[in-house]
């Protein structure tokens, strides 16, 4: 009887972990597609609108943590997309390059939950001037769509360097 119970629990855990890995891989592919779309948007001068709303839930929130805001700053979906479009209108671009993707875990159970963690390097450009930076993100999903992104980067350093080019 003990062997049967052990086998049952082992099989249950295996299939549970396998499902979580499938959710992670699906979410990761969706996120990689989003990054590709953002990079193309900034490279292609014929694109005026960033068609990425379908990647996010309606109540998506981007959380950032600039200096002096230890609780962070919340940016809504519409403001997040508008900010990227405004960057392009100001003749700025961003290219997200080197990326390391890892599976995320549930904060309470510490088990895979389909979320994605990302360490990345990016370049923000104004004309021919470039600012390189690194950042870390945690990306949560609901039914295959991004519900929240938490990002940590040196916003002050990036802003300071960008301001030198904008004078």
Predicted regions and their residues:
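Short, cysteine-centered beta-strand-loop-beta hairpins and adjacent loop/turn segments enriched
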Residues: 69, 123-132
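A solvent-exposed, acidic/Ser-Thr-rich amphipathic alpha-helical stretch
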Residues: 50-114
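A short hydrophobic beta-strand element
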Residues: 112-122
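Sec-dependent N-terminal signal peptides
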Residues: 4-15
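Low-complexity, intrinsically disordered terminal/linker segments enriched in charged
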Residues: 148-167
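Short, low-complexity N-terminal intrinsically disordered segments enriched in polar/charged residues
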Residues: 17-50, 54
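Short, solvent-exposed coil/turn segments at beta-strand boundaries
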Residues: 52-57, 139-147
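Short, surface-exposed coil-to-beta transition loops
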Residues: 117, 130-137
